[in-house]
C-alpha cells in the first residue's frame, strides 16, 4: 500500500486511516463525524446480542472492529469491494487483535476469542452467497442503501435485525423528488417536516421490500441526525406478519398555507397532494431504547458520550406519533411571534394533551392536540 496512514482512536478501537485533504479525497473512506452513528449501533448490539454480524460496506473496518471489541458478537464479517480497503482492514484487525490471518483468495480469517472474516467483494455478491446466515446486517453506504436492500433482506435470518443508513438527504427531503420516486418509490415532502417524512419513507420502503419475502418487521429505532437517516428493524417471519406490517403504511396530507397536516393509513391515497407511501407506525421500541440509555448511563464506553446521551434521551422521551408542529414555521405562516417550546408544552399538558420536543427539529413539538388547539395555544399571550 502506497497510502500515507495515520492512527485514529474511536471507542475501544484504533485504526489506520489514509491521510487526505478531505475525507472525500481519501482512497479509503473514514468519517469521524459518523462515530455517534457507530456508538448507537454498538449500544443496540449490546442490548440485542446477535451472534453473527456483517458490516457490508466496511472501508477502514472501524465499524466491524468496534463490533468485535465492544459487543457480544462472536462472528464478525467485514466487507469492501475496494482492494485498498481490504488491505487496510487486514492491517487494522491485526492492530487490534494479536494473532495471524489465514488468507484464501479474497477472504482473510482471524480466529481468536472471536472469529473475524475480512472479505473483498461486491456486497451484493457476498450477501447472496450467505443466504439467511447473519443475525444482524448493517448497511451504511455512501448515499442510498437501495441497491443493497433486497439482498440484505435475503441474507439476514428470517427473525434477524437489519440496520440501514441513508445519506442521500436531497431525494428524501424533497429537494430532488424524482430521485426519491425512482429510488424509494415514494413522493417526499419538502419543508419543515422533511426529516421525519424522509425517515418514514425509508422505513416504509424497508417494510415493502421485506413483505415480498413474507416478512413483517418491528421498528426498533429510526431517527434523523447530522444529514443522515437511520433505521433498525427486527424481522418477523410469515406472510401474516408481512400483511400486519403493511397496515402501518400510509400517506401524509399537508397544507402549505396553514401548516396543517393529516395522516391516513391506506395502501393507496384517497385524495390529491398525498406524500408517501411512508411508515405511520412506531419509530421505536420503548424497551430497547430504554435499555440502550440505561447501558450508556451505567458507564458503557462510547466515542461521543454526551452527544449520544443527548440523542438517546431525546428519542426515549419523544412522543411516538407521526409528525409535529414546527413553532417557527407556523409562527411565520400565521404571523404569530413563537413562544418558548417549554411554555407551549406546559400549556398543552395542562389541557390534558400529550406533548414533547422532537429530535427532528429544535423548534418542533409532537402532540396529540388538534391543529386548532395548537394554534390557539400559540396565539395566547
UniProtKB/Swiss-Prot annotation:
Superkingdom, natural source: Archaea
Keyword field contains Transferase: yes
Keywords assigned by UniProt, alphabetized: Methyltransferase, RNA-binding, S-adenosyl-L-methionine, Transferase, tRNA processing, tRNA-binding
Top-tier EC class: transferase
Binding site for S-adenosyl-L-methionine: 38, 63, 80, 122-123
Keyword tRNA processing found: yes
GO molecular function, one term: tRNA binding
Catalytic activity line of the entry: guanosine(26) in tRNA + 2 S-adenosyl-L-methionine = N(2)-dimethylguanosine(26) in tRNA + 2 S-adenosyl-L-homocysteine + 2 H(+)
Domain Trm1 methyltransferase: 6-378
Any one of the GO BP annotations: tRNA N2-guanine methylation
EC number(s) per entry: 2.1.1.216
InterPro entries to which the protein is assigned, alphabetical: SAM-dependent_MTases_sf, Trm1, TRM1_arc_bac, tRNA_met_Trm1_C
PROSITE patterns: SAM_MT_TRM1
Physiological role: Dimethylates a single guanine residue at position 26 of a number of tRNAs using S-adenosyl-L-methionine as donor of the methyl groups.
Subunit organization: Monomer.
Sequence similarity: Belongs to the class I-like SAM-binding methyltransferase superfamily. Trm1 family.
Name the record gives this protein: tRNA (guanine(26)-N(2))-dimethyltransferase
Amino acid at each position: 500500500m502506497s497510502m500515507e496512514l495515520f492512527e485514529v482512536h474511536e471507542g475501544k478501537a484504533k485504526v489506520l486511516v489514509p491521510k487526505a485533504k478531505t475525507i472525500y479525497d481519501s482512497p479509503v473512506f473514514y468519517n469521524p463525524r459518523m462515530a455517534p452513528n457507530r456508538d448507537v449501533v454498538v449500544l443496540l448490539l449490546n442490548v440485542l446480542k446477535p451472534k453473527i454480524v456483517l458490516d457490508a460496506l466496511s472501508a477502514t473496518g472501524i465499524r466491524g472492529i468496534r463490533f468485535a471489541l465492544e459487543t457480544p458478537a462472536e462472528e464478525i464479517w467485514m466487507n469492501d469491494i475496494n482492494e485498498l480497503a481490504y488491505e487496510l482492514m487486514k492491517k487494522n484487525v491485526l492492530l487490534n487483535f494479536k494473532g495471524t490471518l489465514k488468507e484464501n483468495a479474497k477472504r482473510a480469517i482471524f480466529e481468536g476469542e472471536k472469529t473475524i472474516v475480512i472479505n473483498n467483494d461486491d456486497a451484493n455478491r457476498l450477501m447472496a452467497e450467505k443466504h439467511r446466515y447473519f443475525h444482524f446486517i448493517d448497511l451504511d453506504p455512501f448515499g442510498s442503501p437501495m441497491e443493497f436492500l433486497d439482498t440484505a433482506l435475503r441474507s439476514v435470518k428470517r427473525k434477524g435485525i437489519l440496520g440501514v443508513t441513508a445519506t442521500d438527504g436531497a431525494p428524501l427531503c424533497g429537494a430532488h423528488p424524482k430521485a426519491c420516486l425512482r429510488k424509494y418509490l415514494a413522493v417526499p415532502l419538502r419543508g419543515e417536516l422533511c426529516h421525519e417524512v424522509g425517515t418514514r419513507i425509508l422505513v416504509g420502503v424497508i417494510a415493502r421490500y421485506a413483505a415480498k419475502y413474507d416478512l413483517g418487521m418491528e421498528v426498533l429505532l429510526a431517527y434523523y441526525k447530522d444529514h443522515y437517516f437511520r433505521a433498525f428493524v427486527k424481522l418477523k417471519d410469515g406472510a401474516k406478519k408481512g400483511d400486519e406490517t403493511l397496515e402501518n403504511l400510509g400517506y401524509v396530507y399537508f397544507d402549505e398555507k396553514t401548516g396543517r397536516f393529516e395522516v391516513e393509513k391506506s395502501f393507496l391515497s384517497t385524495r390529491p397532494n398525498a406524500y408517501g407511501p411512508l411508515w405511520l407506525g412506531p419509530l421505536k421500541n420503548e424497551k430497547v431504547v430504554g435499555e440502550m440509555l440505561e447501558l450508556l448511563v451505567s458507564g458503557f464506553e462510547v466515542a461521543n458520550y454526551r452527544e449520544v446521551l443527548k440523542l438517546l434521551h431525546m428519542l426515549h422521551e419523544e412522543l411516538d406519533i407521526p409528525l409535529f408542529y414546527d413553532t417557527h414555521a407556523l409562527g411565520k405562516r400565521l404571523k404569530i411571534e413563537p413562544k418558548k417550546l417549554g411554555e407551549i408544552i406546559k400549556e398543552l399538558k395542562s389541557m390534558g394533551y400529550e406533548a414533547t420536543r422532537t429530535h427532528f427539529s429544535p423548534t418542533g413539538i409532537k402532540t396529540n392536540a388538534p391543529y386548532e388547539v395548537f394554534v390557539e395555544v400559540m396565539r395566547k399571550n
